[in-house]
Amino acid sequence: MLARSIAAAVQGIDAIKVEIEVTVDWGSGFMVIGLPDIAVKESAERVRCAVQQAGYDFPGKKVMVNMSPADIKKEGSAYDLPLAVGILAGDEKINPDLLGRYMLMGELSLDGSLRPIKGALPMAILARELKLDGFILPRDNAMEAAVVNQLKILPADNLSQVVEFLNGTFELEPTVVDTRAEFAKAQGVFPFDFADVKGQENVKRAFEVACAGGHNILLVGSPGSGKSMMAKRLPSIMPPLTLSEALETTKIHSVAGKLPRGTTLMTTRPFRSPHHTISPVALVGGGSFPMPGEISLAHNGVLFLDELPEFNRSVLEVMRQPLEDRIISISRAKYSTEYPASFMLVASMNPCPCGYYGHPKKKCVCNEYQRTHYMSKISGPLLDRIDLQIEVQPVDFDQMSSKAPGEPSAAIRQRVIAARAIQELRFKDEPGIHCNAQMTPSLLHKYAEPNAAGLEKLRDAMERMNMSARAYDRILKVARTIADLEACADVLDHHIMEAIAYRNLDRPTYMGNGVY
């Protein structure tokens, strides 16, 4: 008998339909065709044991499984459940009437219990698009998939429950989540607050500008000056995720298997901080089993690279394209896929190997060659893509011992949200553009042209600091953001001056001006 079950395969962060056809006929053997990987081929023994442990006889005949479309590679053990159900239906142990109305995905253990899978959210979205009656999956993935409205999410604990449900002798209780209530519940809950930061008002201002416009920022300062501490508080002043951004962010983490158990929807912007020993593949994604990398896991959030020069140069250089395009395209011999990568890059570094160049009290022990070599680990093209380059000075004793709290994150966040609202209105007819950092050259000409005095100051700075055309664009974008924070329709000369002041590493007097 021929039986069909419906499953899904993840490509990028979306799912595509996979139809599993099973025939049980005279003969012997178990064969899976349709471009399965090793894990799918190995499922034969897992499925056999799980079926027997569930109390059913595995057919003593020839089992032929075809997974279509045949040109899409089927990876992982999540196909165990649809394979097992298809085999039992082909052996006439399951009523086939309901089988084509539900998507089934889940890994089987040898005792027949269901284990969690990756990518449940995009699969649930696909099931809704296919107008199926529901999605049967492991219980650990139920809350994640239940974010999708207008689809019945049916969690199961083991194979027996699924078989009995399809035969009409057992009811699977649907999992229901109020997506909007879950989304609103956790808004504004952050573990860190800028009120804890003493002093550093210029750095806080730079962070405010960066968040208001979605700009990349680099902090350069001695050890203990508070670079990492302030960077960790950045999500607390970023604008809240929209519902569509939250869904997209959750999809990426679902595909990567990074969602904590029981999570429904990611309601705060991600903050990713990889170690400097990370490989290029781990950063941008890919591998033999394509997975999102750190830059995609930071999508709609922050990618924090602490001690930037300690990262391998090849790792840093692969970020150049996604920093511009906000998407990462991965092409290999056997596949090609894309992952979103619209993140805010926040990096920190010491000014020299010993860390104390420019320190007001401690003496630097590095020579000029060591300092220049240290800075040269960051290429000019990468540095050009960082809009704000800020020197962080150590906090003096009076500020450190002050009992007065700093400005709370909530107050800064309100100004950031107001500036973002101006940008949303400005770019409402520009597809894919949501903030000033994403402006194209034509939009810069339209919205960020400075007044005559500002243009003259920009010309003088460009000539003195020998800045590139990309740096010119970045200054205009930052100046536009500063104007938005003041609710000013025009970009004025003092906006340009403040934006230029954030290009610290471009100064001729800075020892890092030889970065290449």
Language model regions located:
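Basic, amphipathic alpha-helical bundle interface domains used for macromolecular binding and assembly
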Residues: I33, A39-A44, P59, N66-G76, ...
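Walker B catalytic acidic pair
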Residues: N300, D306-E307, V318
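Residues immediately C-terminal
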Residues: L110, L303-F304, E310-F311, F397
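Short beta-strand elements
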Residues: V18-V24, L283, D387-I390
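P-loop NTPase nucleotide-binding/switch module
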Residues: F170-V209, G213, P240-I295
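Walker A/P-loop
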Residues: L219-P260, D325
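Peripheral, non-AAA+ core regions of ATP-driven protein-machinery
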Residues: M1-L218, S222-S225, S331, A471-Y472, ...
